[in-house]
A protein has these predicted regions:
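Pre-Walker A adenine-sensing motif
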Residues: 1-29
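Conserved Walker A/P-loop ATP-binding site and its immediately adjacent core
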Residues: 38, 42-81, 104, 164-168
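Short glycine/proline-enriched coil/turn segments at helix->beta-strand junctions
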Residues: 29-32, 48-54, 68-73, 122, ...
């Protein structure tokens, strides 16, 4: 089993370009990605991937702007109802829909999926972007960890960060 793989991103390339050179069409599953640099288009890569996705981002402005730029995408955060999410899922059931959410909005997606009888754990890929925020922000934003209760139940998943927290070595 492979535990560590490096994909080099050349000057002028995006994350998707490096993946394609390595024979991957989109973000691999069941991995933790340290992309080293922000702004390489990893989230864009998932937004254009031919699969149903839940993308967790730490901030509302990011999910709003990304959802506006992509078809079959819905931003889920405070003020978006479970009914709206369920309606979106019904309308896009046969498409590669993208649900962008804050960690706090994840529960709405979970409830909407249950309401329309979609098994999110088998039908969707989940990407936790800026996953370092789980550790950095939990002391003042306890609900940021809520999606982790479900994360490992997904068959297809990935954590990604340009600024991961490196564990301290034991002395």
């Amino acid at each position: 089993m492979e535990y560590d793989r490096t994909y080099s991103i050349r000057k002028g390339e995006y994350f998707a370009d490096a993946l394609k050179r390595a024979g991957k069409d989109f973000i691999p599953t069941n991995c933790i990605i340290n992309k080293l640099l922000p702004g390489l288009g990893a989230t864009h890569c998932e937004l254009t991937a031919p699969r149903k996705s839940i993308i967790i981002e730490p901030n509302v402005p990011v999910i709003e702007s990304k959802a506006k730029k992509h078809k079959n995408a819905l931003a889920v955060y405070k003020g978006v109802t479970i009914r709206k999410v369920a309606d979106f899922l019904e309308e896009n059931r046969d498409k590669h829909y993208k649900l962008l959410t804050t960690p706090e909005g994840f529960t709405k997606i979970k409830e909407a999926m249950q309401a329309v009888e979609i098994d999110m754990y088998t039908e969707c890929f989940i990407l936790f972007d800026e996953c370092e925020k789980l550790v950095q922000d939990v002391h003042y934003r306890d609900s940021i960890r809520e999606p982790m209760n479900d994360f490992f139940r997904f068959q297809n998943k990935a954590l990604i960060s340009a600024t991961p927290i490196i564990p301290e070595k034991d002395n």
